[in-house]
Amino acid sequence: MKDIKLKDKIAQGINDLFYIWKREFQTTFRDQGVLIFFILVPLGYPLLYSFIYDNEVVREVPAVVVDDSHSSLSREYLRKVDATPDIQIVSYCADMEEAKQMLKNRRAYGIIYIPSDFSDNIAKGKQTQVSIYCDMSGLLYYKSMLLANTAVSLNMNKDIKIARSGNTTDRQDEITAYPIEYEEISIFNPTTGFAAFLIPAVLVLIIQQTLLLGIGLAAGTARENNRFKDLVPINRHYNGTLRIVLGKGLSYFLVYILVAFYVLYVVPRLFSLNQIGQPSSLVLFVVPYLAACIFFAMTASIAIRNRETCMLIFVFTSVPLLFISGISWPGAAIPPFWKYVSYIFPSTFGINGFVKINNMGATLSEVAFEYKALWLQAGIYFLATCWVYRWQILMSRKHAIERYKELKEKENLSKQISD
């Protein structure tokens, strides 16, 4: 008899699990807000970010010149700088005040200053200098200014060395110009571009943030539709912790398997971003990342009291999470406190592991730290979600019983009055 009851309970639990999965799946596609965060945002945001940074590098940065030397050598230097793809000289200013005013009016983003003793020092065999002033509100402007001027100065240094060496053969000129021959190879980012460096991290973060917003919005809707403002409704199918957590989690997981494939595989391929990882390693890595994000979002949804709250709580976290992940800002430069704070979020391990696998060709064993951390987070947040929903079930029952007693007392009171 006990075996039959146990089998019935298991069968009922599985039936309830799929009922909850079905209801949550329907909510995803019927609720416009959830649909936006689960489908439209993951479809649109990756394309938007990728289109913005598709050029990879900034070209033809407007720059102005203050040339106090007025020599043939300074003019040669400026012609070569203007010939680079990085800088476009838009004006020659009489003094630094005029140049500063052009920067202030956003007509240029950098100043090239050549001192009056530029060619004299070179003729005397002394070291000279060229000063660069750049608008640091955009680091890519600074990068273009620095690269162009560095390349031109090195090229002119080579020509000056050769001219003064008195060599008689081309081979001697080569040795004079480059005593140590070197070859520059950009590993894992051949274009040294901004998109190849930043977009993979943004794509991984989009998955976590849209899950937080979508699940939070669904939780806010559930509370608003509940008579007692509880997260779990009074329903015989919602009479167990595991069936609720697994039913909801399975629904989100099935939706985001497709979303993750699009965001992490299709989008990088559309924009020709670096993809050298093994697909099998990537799939095995994404599974715990999705699980950790889903249960993390379900745990965090306990704080959501209405539909709008999730926007106030979660949206602003995107930029800080990108910084403390260790990709856009060097991990070694992040203070220990913020590094430990970053370990709370699945995106930290997800971003670092994905970049290593997808962009650097790492295997699963080479990202063992991130992989194990994601499974650990998935387990911890699963238990936290179970605790949260168990507490919500008890609170829902408590409110229902209190309401029942209240109605019963009113009924008894009305009978006494009528008698």
Where would I find each of the regions flagged by the language model?
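Hydrophobic core positions of alpha-helical segments in small-molecule transporters
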Residues: 37-38, 200, 246-247, 310-313, ...
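Hydrophobic alpha-helical transmembrane segments of multi-pass membrane transport proteins
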Residues: 44-47, 185-267
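Extracytoplasmic/periplasmic domains immediately adjacent to an N-terminal transmembrane anchor
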Residues: 1-196, 366, 391, 397-419
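Membrane-spanning alpha-helical segments of multipass transporters and channels
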Residues: 48-49, 70, 91, 101, ...
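Loop-to-transmembrane-helix entry motif
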Residues: 28-35, 206, 247-253, 257, ...
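Hydrophobic alpha-helical transmembrane segments of integral membrane proteins
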Residues: 38-39, 196-197, 316-317, 342
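Alpha-helical membrane-protein architecture signal
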Residues: 14, 18-22, 196, 237-250, ...
